[in-house]
Design a protein with these regions (language model features):
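Active-site-proximal mixed secondary-structure blocks
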Residues: 13-19, 24-76, 82-182
Length: 182
């Protein structure tokens, strides 16, 4: 009986007025837990994003380095990232708008101006520094310096590589496609 009550409580984790990440369902629910039905139009954008991020996980993290027209470096992590094709090799990532104010991120501005990016895999040893690079600094602030990463000259593209990264993929941007409002 205790499990049934717990199951019912789990089913009510999305109250009407307030939703927080701790209220997103987990994969640890009992087998007989009722399915939670959500309509995207009923959720705020932040709640929808958290729900999608929970549902598609764990996700790899891409650490993307770009430069602007003036050669200023930007370094930013992205959890909406994956490999889409092998032949030709194609990576995708989504520099969604900032949650704070809906503005576009420097990474997007940079790849539109200089269509090159270095995508790095993030190791466990890099987690804290990667988190520091995710801070929303003003345009022009060098996240390599703020996070304590070592920039290394790339071989094929202009943005630098992260010396500490186990993998760095130097990429030319083939396409930037706007999807939705954020």
């Amino acid at each position: 009986m205790k499990n049934q009550k717990s199951c019912q409580q789990e089913a009510l984790i999305f109250p009407e007025k307030r939703r927080v990440p701790s209220q997103i369902p987990t994969f640890n629910q009992p087998e007989n837990a009722p399915m939670i039905h959500l309509k995207p139009e009923d959720l705020s954008i932040p709640d929808l994003q958290r729900t999608l991020q929970f549902a598609v996980g764990p996700r790899p993290i891409a650490l993307a380095s770009t430069i602007d027209r003036d050669g200023r470096v930007n370094l930013s992590p992205f959890s909406f990232f994956n490999v889409f094709s092998t032949n030709p090799p194609i990576l995708i990532f989504s520099p969604a708008n900032r949650g704070r104010d809906g503005s576009t991120k420097d990474t997007l501005h940079n790849v539109l101006a200089v269509p090159e990016v270095v995508i790095h895999s993030v190791s466990h040893a890099m987690v804290e520094q990667t988190s520091l690079s995710s801070t929303e600094y003003p345009t022009g602030v060098n996240e390599f310096l703020k996070a304590g990463f070592t920039p290394v000259e790339s071989t094929l593209v202009h943005p630098p590589r992260v010396a500490e990264a186990p993998v760095a993929m130097e990429c030319e941007v083939l396409e930037v496609k706007a999807l939705g409002d954020g």
